Amino acid sequence: MEIALQAINLTKKYSDKVVAVDKLNLEIGKGEIFGLLGPNGAGKTTTGGMLTTRILPSSGSAYIGGIDVVKHPAEVKHEIGVVPQTNTLDRSLSVEQNLYFHGRYFGFSRSDSKMRTEDLLRQFRLSERADAPVMALSGGMAQRLMLARAVFHSPTVLILDEPTSGLDPQSRLALWDVLGELHSRGQTILLTTHYMEEADHLCQRLAIMDHGKILALGTPNQLKSNLGSGSTLWVEANRDSSTYIEKLQSQDLLSTKYSLRATGKGVTIIGNAITEIISTVTRTIESQGLSIVSLKVEEPTLETVFISLTGRDLRE
């Protein structure tokens, strides 16, 4: 596998007590879509900041296209395309001008920049809005324009920080299609996200991060099948879960082999051979004079993997 991006013991400390990224090791192959999945504060954005030269690492090293990110930041900027969380389009320019002047900034001639701009407007389905001010774009269109700008100079690696955050479901799906098209053209993509379905749908491999560390790495299917995260049993009674979760936790079978979490009136139980404990769960709840309102079993998801690794979900 030809390596497009490599991080070796990459670390960022803001103080002795605040370690944003802790000895991160990572290799991303050329043409791969790789995801960093984790909650806010996991270290994803800081990792992206170091890889894009915006944040100086405290220690460790990183290479993009074989170029040292710390020693040669100016050269690295020609190897990366970046789409940050915030809208960084020039509001004083039109859609077309945002692309054209980006090309000029990267050394394209007037004619080459104009030609590349026209190609990207077609590719990203923005031709009809070429003369529109960027302020008139919807969130999805603005994100497509930032993507088009980021790949203008054909970067080795495209780095996206929470690319669909704040988009409506339709715009999110449309952006997934655009990223899929870029990948089909051989573009290497690193994206950070806290959306499990996004990581599952887009990423060939992903790393689950929390508190600045990589907890697990693999394909989505590998993570779901190899980490022993098990299936999920969700049960809801006719009263708040606080009235019966302690009783469930007092059962030796449940407390030693399964992860239990209260979720409003329901309880989520994660573990292997989940169907074997259904009778124990229902009997325990009913012994408290309660009745079962809902019960369902679900196969492993990236969320259950994360919960099994951290004891909490991505939204906490």
Please report, for each region that a protein language model flagged, where it lies by residue.
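ABC transporter nucleotide-binding domain
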Residues: 177-272
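ABC transporter nucleotide-binding domains
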Residues: 2-5, 12-197, 201-210, 216
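Residues at or immediately flanking beta-strands
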Residues: 61, 94, 133, 232, ...
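Short beta->alpha junction loops/turns
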Residues: 69, 238, 270, 274, ...
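C-terminal coupling/interaction segments
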Residues: 273-316
